[in-house]
Amino acid sequence: IFHAVSAFNNAGFSTNSDNLVPFVSDAWLLLPLAGALIGGGLGFPVWAELVRLVRRDRHVVHRISITARMTLAATAVLLVSGTVFFGCMEWTGLLSSMSLGGKLLNSFFASASPRTAGFNAIDYGQAHPITLMGTDILMFIGGGSAGTAGGIKVTTACVLLAAMAAEFTGRETTTIGHRSLPRSVTRQALALSFAGVMVVTLGVVALRFFDPEFSGDQVSFEVLSAFATVGLSTGITASLSAPSQIVLCLIMYLGRVGPTTLVAALAAKSV
């Protein structure tokens, strides 16, 4: 029960000192937990729309909102791409001793967990540096805008990609799914993303200053995990100096409260 609630709320807490590493080959545990943390990361508004869609009157046309569609599509893309990426990078590394099913299972779990709960069934301290970089990206993006996951949110990432596409193709408006987005939405996405990049950059600089003995890959992983309130680690957290740990605490607070506060403030000003 504890792990199920921890997964759905994207807390990532485990009653085991080594998290889910002892259950690395237990599909009956990892798959339900992955489903719970993905479900919690989608957010209740998305689930409410899906329920209404299932229960809809056949004579009434019901459309899923653009936010729900972005959340579902981006989640699916990130899960698939993350699974393929992790499998390719660690097939002969962390996954080398596992069966084919175990490799696929842990690649999928390693794709789902970093954006939300932060459970780990493998030792990230032994992961390839490129694997850590890919996981950094997943953590920074996060989950649904109304979900329990952290990060800048998948909807923000979708808006940024749409804005880039509009700029590259010379279009005046940003469109997603044949719908034009207000300029204020694009500005909010840019502001939120830039604020996130600034917090992460300053955090990495601070930790490298206080603890220069750790590699940039390790430090970046710790900072992004804190910013996205994921909780994954390469194993250096306990060895960090007190100033670095204080910096991580501040980053956790900013990562959890900052994006929501910024978007709410910008939205209030536009009313």
Give the label of every model feature segment.
Residues 1-271:
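Membrane-proximal intracellular helices of multi-pass ion channels
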